[in-house]
Amino acid sequence: MLESMPGMGSGYMHGMIPYYRTKLPVFYAIETRDWKSAAALEPVAGSPPEVSTLVYWARAVAHGHLRQSEQARADLARYDELLVEIRKGKRAYIAEGTFTKIEHAEMLGWVAFAEGKQDEAFTNMRTVADLQDKVGQAEVDIPAREMLADMLLESGHAQQALSEYEIALKLSPNRLNGLYNAGRAAEAAGERSKAQFYYATLMKSTNNGQNSTRPELTHARRFVSVTQSAAN
């Protein structure tokens, strides 16, 4: 796609090419929750260190979900090495920025989660979620509070997860993963009316999932249909 845009071939926009070649695959893998693909991401050739950090952030998140602690810790170590490189360059301020601190704290949370240190993981992620709620997100950031909810749900704390998803959705409304997993958490917590609400909202926001084969939408559609049939 980028090769078809000749205006990006020189000047400032040329320098943005590694950024977009990195960012698009990273967020596609994370948003589709394709953890194996996210864990296999590699920096784009020629990327500056401040761009490559995004790859290792995504890998740490993925390895956290996959419970691959050694790999998650290696991702964190490489991220830290890149921060050292950034501090030596002309854009050293990036290493001390709030969004970098949020990314780094999220990685610490996922490393702890992968290592089975649930309480530490929850504490780290709750702290960073509170910070992010105050300062706001970058344009396509994954809400840290949604990550906290993911951890709680994957650890069997459905009711707590539901509460965190609900807070996340107030700040980042209509996110597919937020709505779907709020529905999952509600189901697991035995709150079928809330599950129905979140799944129905998901169906509405995706045009009933007509143009998608994602299993999340299939599950939500089936749940809504069964619940509506039972009510009639």
What residue spans do the PLM features occupy?
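Solenoid-like repeat scaffolds
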Residues: L2-G15, L41-E50, D80-E96, A129-Q137, ...
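TPR/TPR-like (Sel1-like) alpha-helical repeat modules
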Residues: M1-S4, R73-V84, L176, E187-N211
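Residues that mark the junctions of alpha-helical repeat units in TPR/alpha-solenoid scaffolds
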Residues: P18, S52, I94-G97, K101, ...
